[in-house]
Every structure is written in C-alpha cells, then in structure tokens.
UniProtKB/Swiss-Prot annotation:
Protein name: Acrylate reductase cytochrome subunit
One GO cellular component term noted in the UniProt record for this chain: periplasmic space
Description of pH dependence: Optimum pH is 7.5.
A molecular function GO annotation: oxidoreductase activity
Catalytic EC class: oxidoreductase
Cofactor note: Binds 4 heme c groups per subunit.
Lineage, highest ranks first: Bacteria, Pseudomonadati, Pseudomonadota, Gammaproteobacteria, Alteromonadales
Binding of heme c 2, residues: H29, C54, C57, H58
Species in which this protein is naturally found: Shewanella woodyi (strain ATCC 51908 / MS32)
Signal peptide: 1-22
EC number: 1.3.2.-
Induction: Part of the ard operon, which is induced under anaerobic conditions. Expression is further induced by acrylate and methacrylate. Not induced under aerobic conditions.
Cofactor: heme c
InterPro entries, A to Z: Multihaem_cyt_sf (IPR036280), Tetrahaem_cytochrome (IPR012286)
Keyword tags: Electron transport, Heme, Iron, Metal-binding, Oxidoreductase, Periplasm, Signal, Transport
Length: 117
C-alpha cells in the first residue's frame, strides 16, 4: 500500500509539473498574457487561432514593410512573398506556445534573422 501511495504521489507531482510548463508564451506577447485565452483562440482553446485573431493586433501590410528586403531579394519577404503573397496563414511560421520554423525553410536556405517563432 505504501508503494502504491508513493507511485501515485510521484505521478501526480509529475502531472502538476507538466501542466505548469505546458503553456509557454513568447515575450513579445506580454500584453496579452493574463487575458482570456479566447482573445487569441477564437476557434476554441484547443484549436489554432485564426488569422483574423492575429490581425486584431498585427497589420499584414506593416509586417510586409518591416520585413521587406532589397530589390533583388524582394520576394524573400515572409509577409509578402512570391509563392503566397500576403495570404500565408500566420500559424504556418509562428507559434505562441512552441517554436516553429518559417515554412520557406522547407525548400529554401535563406534566413530571416528577426523571425519570431
């Protein structure tokens, strides 16, 4: 019985520890920390946010301007690129609770030094 209680205690302690670590948030979203999860998770807390949720705070035209490159590399802009224009879903490159690589890196080798995972 003592062994059972010990094992149960260890399992419960592990679960509490995991749940505390499970919700990771990026520093650049400090202003939304503490708000209701539904402010971003507009399709339910178990689903990814829609682009409309991201666009409540972020403007795609401003992002495209901020990430613009020189003329010869202008289509290497993650927010206005040759393949998707400005239509690529935000979650393809960005994740709030876990790091993500830009979708471009699946085929291309150019880097985005300021990429926020």
């Amino acid at each position: 019985m003592k062994m059972y209680k010990l094992m149960l205690g260890l399992v419960l302690a592990g679960l509490v520890s995991l749940s505390a670590q499970a919700i990771e948030q990026r520093d650049y979203h400090k202003e939304v920390i503490g708000k209701d999860c539904k402010s971003c998770h507009d399709q339910g807390v178990k689903n990814y946010p829609s682009d409309q949720a991201c666009l409540q705070c972020h403007d795609v035209d401003e992002l495209a301007e901020e990430t613009a490159r020189s003329e010869e590399d202008k289509w290497q802009n993650p927010h206005n690129n040759l393949h998707y224009g400005k239509e690529l879903p935000c979650i393809e490159c960005h994740g709030e609770h876990e790091a993500k690589k830009p979708i471009c890196s699946n085929c291309h080798t150019f880097k985005y030094d300021k990429h926020k995972e």
